[in-house]
């Protein structure tokens, strides 16, 4: 922020994270920004709660909110011109897991189908880049194994049969991300 001389207005979390601590509270304190999340979140420190179809305006630009529950109950994606920021709803070559608190394979199927209805040209920027940092919806529709599953029942069976290990610090992350008060622990701690 300092390097570019940028003025931050908002910090947006696409969902409540169970795998790491969000930096929203730290950024709010340091830069005076408003924290934005979907209205379904149970995080108490949110300044702006958005819903499907809302716009997060900055200058003459806006991010359009698409509510995409499934990975979590408060998951959302953000459309900006020819880009879509998918959080953990859609990953490159995969999608967010649905076995963590608030996850639903049924809702994830519905949310992914909603994203599939968008134009192939949208560039996809996921919350995690396990493979690459950017893709297109067209490539994901063709190559992403989660998007090529033909039926809802088959998708739900696949997602509910997967039992990856829980995130190592799930309890710590959920507590941090659902606690209203930022507790000063020293610069960088808690992120």
Segments and roles (model prediction):
Residues 32, 58-64, 86, 90, ...:
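Short secondary-structure transition/capping segments
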Residues 23-26, 98, 137-138:
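Short amphipathic alpha-helical segments
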Residues 11-21, 68-73, 125-132:
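Histidine-centered catalytic micro-motifs
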Residues 23, 107, 133:
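Short phosphate-engaging motifs
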Residues 22, 102-103, 150:
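Residue-level signal for the nucleotide or nucleotide-sugar donor/cofactor binding architecture
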Residues 110-123, 127-191:
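Accessory terminal helices/loops
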């Amino acid at each position: 922020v300092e390097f570019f001389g940028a003025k931050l207005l908002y910090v947006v979390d696409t969902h409540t994270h169970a795998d790491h601590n969000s930096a929203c509270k730290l950024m709010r304190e340091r830069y005076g920004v408003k924290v934005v999340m979907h209205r379904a979140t149970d995080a108490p420190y949110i300044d702006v709660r958005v819903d499907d179809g809302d716009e997060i305006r900055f200058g003459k630009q806006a991010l359009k909110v698409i509510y995409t529950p499934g990975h979590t109950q408060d998951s959302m994606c953000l459309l900006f011109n020819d880009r879509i920021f998918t959080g953990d709803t859609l990953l490159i070559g995969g999608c967010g897991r649905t076995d963590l608190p608030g996850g639903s394979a049924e809702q994830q199927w519905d949310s992914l189908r909603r994203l599939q209805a968008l134009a192939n040209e949208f560039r996809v920027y996921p919350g995690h880049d396990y493979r690459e940092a950017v893709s297109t919806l067209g490539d994901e529709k063709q190559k992403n194994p989660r998007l090529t599953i033909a039926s809802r029942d088959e998708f739900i069976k696949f997602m509910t049969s997967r039992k990856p290990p829980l995130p190592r610090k799930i309890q710590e992350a959920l507590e941090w991300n659902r606690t209203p008060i930022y507790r000063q622990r020293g610069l960088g701690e808690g992120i």
